């Protein structure tokens, strides 16, 4: 049975990824700082992991075992809405830790297992991380951390290409989650189902790409 490691799986998109993959018979390793009743009800393997704890993230590969078919680095934070003072700047730094550095460290930590399975490494990004698409400004911490994630994942895809691993970043759309709000047009089920179709279709030619949940390629 194929296996998937999902971060930030206690709610929102991460929970929906865990629900859908579990329903399809995958062996799911779900991580979160704290679990939730909804996640516990799925009956999947739940591991505590705080993405702010970089030592724990970097050593997580030993908890995966041999062979990893899919990593979905989903956990993230919005960070401060503006950066106008030293306190905001500290929040910006923490946003980079969670949204950029920790996902990359985790991908590196599980790379040996992914190589064994010729697996896929997926970073959940956002269209707000596209420099070309930024026509409205604002949200400095979130935008910049996701733009950096995109750049890191692009390099990761190049670095792992010879080992048979496929790596890409995905934009889930504007989704009804705690981050997206209730006015968002997409439900988590729709977004995740779309992203799963994109993931299924990824091959070496698409590695290093940036795609929306509907398969549309997004400019960097």
Segments and roles (model prediction):
Residues 77, 84-96, 101-105, 117-161:
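Catalytic loop of short-chain dehydrogenase/reductase
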């Amino acid at each position: 049975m194929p296996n998937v490691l999902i971060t930030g799986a206690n709610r929102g998109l991460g929970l929906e990824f865990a629900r859908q993959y579990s329903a399809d018979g995958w062996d799911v390793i779900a991580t979160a700082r704290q679990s939730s009743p909804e996640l516990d009800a799925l009956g999947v393997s739940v591991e505590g992991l705080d993405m702010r704890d970089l030592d724990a993230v970097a050593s997580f590969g030993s908890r995966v075992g041999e062979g990893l078919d899919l990593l979905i680095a989903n956990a993230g934070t919005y960070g401060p809405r503006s950066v106008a003072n030293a306190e905001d700047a500290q929040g910006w730094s923490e946003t980079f830790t969670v949204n950029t550095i920790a996902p990359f460290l985790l991908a590196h930590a599980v790379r040996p297992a992914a190589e064994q399975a010729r697996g896929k490494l997926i970073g959940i990004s956002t269209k707000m991380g596209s420099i070309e698409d930024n026509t409205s400004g604002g949200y400095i911490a979130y935008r910049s951390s996701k733009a950096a994630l995109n750049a890191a994942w692009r390099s990761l895809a190049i670095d792992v290409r010879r080992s048979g691993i496929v790596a890409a970043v995905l934009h889930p759309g504007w989704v009804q989650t705690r981050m997206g709000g209730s006015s968002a047009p997409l439900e988590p089920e729709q977004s995740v189902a779309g992203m799963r179709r994109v993931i299924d279709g990824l091959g070496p030619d698409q590695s290093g790409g940036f795609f929306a949940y509907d398969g549309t390629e997004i400019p960097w």
